[in-house]
Amino acid sequence: MKFATVSTLRASSQPALVIEDRVHTLPYADMKAVIAAGAAKAASRTSKESLSLEEVNFHSPIHPTTLRDAYAFEQHVVTANRNRGREVPEEWYQFPVFYFTNPNAVFGHEDVIP
């Protein structure tokens, strides 16, 4: 059993449950609503009809509201500083650098990327 977000030729993006090779849609607005309802409750509300894997397009399971990306992971920072003959500044450990990026740039399996 796997949770997914899918679309079909007839319906736009909707949460679903994949059981073996069948896809059962869920009566929720999105995957965040499924999580809020609880996995067990959501799973008990699957559609009676099911679709084959070939009948759906899979998308990013959860569309993030915001998205952060880290400047670099520790080993990269250590190596880069060592190559310059310096130690990693203590501030890097206290205030790791990150930035906000575009949450609309998240795509799912086989999505067409513009």
Model-found features: residue ranges?
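Well-ordered beta-strand scaffold positions
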Residues: D21-R22
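Active-site microenvironments in enzyme catalytic cores
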Residues: K2-A11, T25-Y28, V34-P114
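Short beta-strand-centered aromatic/proline hotspots
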Residues: Q14-L17
